[in-house]
């Protein structure tokens, strides 16, 4: 039976019974794309502010297509009570729609909020270039812009273009310069361990061509950037949209979109302060290794590592969570999980990629990109695309607060 989509704007609170569990999960539809509307929403980004507020962002695609094809704005909503209710929709930044202009559109946002202050950083694509087009080159690059807040997202700076600050990091690479890139949308990683500058270190994972993913990092909350592993490092050659996460010992994991699952790689520091270190070899995670399988799709997802308690013996552990559409195709977004070993140093790429637990199914309909963060109450804030419409160009942007007990079939909290 097909689910009929009701073309009204729904801002209220709903309850959903999980497909895998009888527990009730709170659900908010933050942005809705009516099927009759020609202006779609897409692309989730979320951050938890230092003061406890939660900011959710999304593309509002007036051009009807991806960033690079015309005018795209970024809209937002804020929760000031931990996700229980949400304020009105607002425009964070508006594209001019002027063809060829650097401010033609703004989209594919990635965001981080500093854990020690009210500082917030949003990175996004700007302009009217298409990432994969042959005409998008080092001389005509996919451009990168930032917005900054110093007061937990209440007010924002003027946008600033930082394209050259990123691209020049790779101009002297033995592999040649980066022709086109963008920061993987959703959540920028802030280290829980490394602070050698004004702020805890942040990492942004790049989708880049040629030669796949790169990772950049900053010790001054995005004022200056460095290439993790140096300009020649290729964490995931030919990788697609990526995310970063940090192991409890400070090593960095990149998780990259792949057909049928994910690609993982781990960065081993030799000197955390200077950033020196080396990437390993890529490991695939999919059905073959009992990994994070996604049937008949490749899609942006989120990797998150959180502290937890194993309910069987009350032992404190760390869990890795990875979201993907379970499929077939872009449908049935879910969350895989696995307990990390107590000896974190023993984690290898092969062991991390394999043997994940049966996933929790978040959505029971068409669904795609997702991101998540750990709330102060220990639950998971999950923000994702659902009810895909307009031939895949639009969706509803849905927020759910999900307890770890629900995700892990009552094994952890």
Question: Whereabouts are the PLM-identified features?
Answer:
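Positively charged n-region of N-terminal signal peptides that target proteins for export
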Residues: 1-5
């Amino acid at each position: 039976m097909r689910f009929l989509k009701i073309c009204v704007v729904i801002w209220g609170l709903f309850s959903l019974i999980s497909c895998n569990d009888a527990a009730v999960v709170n659900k908010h539809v933050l942005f809705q794309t009516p099927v009759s509307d020609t202006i779609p929403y897409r692309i989730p980004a979320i951050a938890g502010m230092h003061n406890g507020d939660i900011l959710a962002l999304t593309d509002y695609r007036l051009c009807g297509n991806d960033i690079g094809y015309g005018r795209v704005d970024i809209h937002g909503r804020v929760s000031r009570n931990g996700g229980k209710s949400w304020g009105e929709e607002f425009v964070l930044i508006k594209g001019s729609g002027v063809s060829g202009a650097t401010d033609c559109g703004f989209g594919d946002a990635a965001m981080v909020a500093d854990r020690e202050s009210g500082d917030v950083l949003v990175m996004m694509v700007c302009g009217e270039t298409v990432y994969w087009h042959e005409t998008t080159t080092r001389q005509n690059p996919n451009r990168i812009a930032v917005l900054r807040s110093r007061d937990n997202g209440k007010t924002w700076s003027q946008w600033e273009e930082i394209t050259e600050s990123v691209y020049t990091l790779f101009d002297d690479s033995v592999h040649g310069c980066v022709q086109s890139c963008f920061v993987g949308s959703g959540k920028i990683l802030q280290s829980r361990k490394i602070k050698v500058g004004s702020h805890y270190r942040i990492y942004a994972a790049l989708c880049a061509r040629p030669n796949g993913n790169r990772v950049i990092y900053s010790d001054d909350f995005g004022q200056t950037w460095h290439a993790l592993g140096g300009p020649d490092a290729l964490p995931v050659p030919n990788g697609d949209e990526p995310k970063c996460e940090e192991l409890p010992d400070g090593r960095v994991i990149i998780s990259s979109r792949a057909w049928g699952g994910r690609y993982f790689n781990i960065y081993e520091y030799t000197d955390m302060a200077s950033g020196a270190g080396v990437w390993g070899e890529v490991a695939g995670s999919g059905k073959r290794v009992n990994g994070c399988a996604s049937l008949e799709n490749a899609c942006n997802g989120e990797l998150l590592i959180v502290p937890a308690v194993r309910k069987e013996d009350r032992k404190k552990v760390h869990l890795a969570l990875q979201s993907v559409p379970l499929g077939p195709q872009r449908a049935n977004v879910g969350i895989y999980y696995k307990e990390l070993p107590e000896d974190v140093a023993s984690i290898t790429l092969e062991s991390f990629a394999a043997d994940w637990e049966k996933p929790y199914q978040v959505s029971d309909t068409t669904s795609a990109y997702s991101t998540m963060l750990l709330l102060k109450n220990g639950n998971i804030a999950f923000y994702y695309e659902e009810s895909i419409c307009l031939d895949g160009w639009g969706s509803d942007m849905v927020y759910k607060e999900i307890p770890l007990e629900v995700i892990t079939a009552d094994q952890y909290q």
